[in-house]
């Protein structure tokens, strides 16, 4: 059995990394996959959501990940906001795919581009995910998508 490891990561706080992790994990769990979400964020937001008992998958702290993920089909790691290249290297080594949540705001896009440049040093597939998108502001979403795509960042 091959376990797939997906990590959400980014330099900026408040771009919905935890929300993205929870939605990805819920999607896969609801499609019949065995999913564990590893909460590696200092704030432990995913753990707080899980304590309400409404998630269709287990959420465990990083310290319990080795044992808790043994029988999972998919492990989603909710990474913390960081630009530390050594931390990024460790996450990459433990991941099959990286998701970079970003808003359509210019600073968030800039940081996603910077993160992409760091990820390009490693042999890891990744994609940006535009989050917190206001449907009334379609132009800003299209501009963000165009900028990221124009820099060969999968969106």
Q: For the regions a protein language model found, what residue spans apply to each?
A:
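Short linear functional motifs in flexible/disordered or boundary regions
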Residues: 20, 33, 58, 107-110, ...
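P-loop/Walker-type NTP enzyme "switch/lid" segment
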Residues: 2-15, 22-93, 146
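Short amphipathic alpha-helical "recognition" segments used for binding
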Residues: 15-16, 136
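Conserved catalytic-core segment of NTP-binding enzymes
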Residues: 74-155
């Amino acid at each position: 059995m091959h376990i797939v490891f997906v990590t959400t990561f980014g330099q900026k706080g408040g771009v919905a990394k935890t929300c993205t992790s929870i939605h990805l994990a819920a999607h896969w769990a609801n499609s019949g996959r065995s999913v564990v979400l590893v909460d590696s964020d200092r704030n432990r937001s995913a753990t707080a959501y899980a304590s309400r008992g409404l998630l269709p998958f287990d959420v465990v702290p990083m310290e319990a990940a080795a044992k808790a993920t043994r029988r999972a089909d998919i492990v989603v790691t909710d990474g913390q906001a960081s630009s530390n290249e050594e931390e990024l290297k460790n996450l990459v080594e433990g991941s099959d795919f990286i998701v970079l949540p970003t808003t359509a705001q210019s600073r968030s896009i800039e940081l996603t581009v910077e993160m992409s440049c760091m990820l390009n040093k490693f042999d890891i597939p990744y994609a940006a995910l535009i989050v917190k998108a206001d449907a009334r502001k379609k132009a800003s979403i299209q501009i963000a998508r165009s900028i990221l795509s124009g820099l060969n960042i999968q969106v």
